[in-house]
Amino acid sequence: IKLSDHTVVSTDMLVEGVHFDMTFTPLKHLGYKSVIVNLSDIYAMNAEPKQITVSLAISSKYTLEAIDELYDGVLLACEKYNVDIIGGDITSCLNGLTISITSIGNCKKKDLVYRSGAKENDLLIVTGDLGGAYMGLNVLQREKEVWKSNPNMQPDLDNFNYILERQLKPEARKDIITFFKESVLKPTSMIDISDGLASEIFHICKKSKVGCQLYEDKIPIDSQTYQTSMDFNINPTVSALNGGEDYELLFTLNQKDYEKIKGNPNMTIIGHITKKEAGINLISNGDVSTPLKAQGWNHFEI
């Protein structure tokens, strides 16, 4: 790390029974995902992750082979994102599995992006599509209940490949940070979508002391996510707003930079920033404005 750079650090902990269910989570996928959720936080500051530490608390129900499988996923993510493991710890616990990863990155001070820089009239932009991870989780939980009532029943996972991958093996948006650098583009604020779009919009608006207009018909939702939401009698917009675990990037951009992102298939303009007094509002498909509500992840509810 160059002396002129700033160091960016993020830590995330994943606890069995709270953040993941071993009934349907392959250990290799879990190892991979545990790295991704940390790297995503670093990218959300427009920084580049360089190193991680990995700490585990493991109960006796896990074999050495199981631990190896978990680490295979960790190593796969590190290899893909060019990150080094520089340390960690491992200890026993009475039950379950807990994974704690700390990621360390760097960025020039002038390039750092926080949640607090959004200004009135900035564009509100999101990468990728939303709600897929949440609907993938719904499918897995449904099949778990079927299996519990009839262990001989094979899970019905056909036609759900995309949303299952969004849940079990997400990716971090390194490509977007590369695009920013190549385009000499700097968002005014940014956050990754771990707790749901609505929740992250509130974070940016609160830190930036601004309001927002979010347009329902602009929210990007994949066709598989949409159809699965309908099958579960869940409004697809609710899946996107409150589902979480998408690990896409939500950012604001000065309107003068619009031409640099125009036509980019990886980004969707979903609204704009307003004065704080105007509030945080969702403009529905019927062109009706209602205050946006955030019902994302609550760390103290299980």
What kind of region is each of these model predictions?
Residues 1-302:
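Helix-biased detector of long, well-ordered alpha-helical tracts
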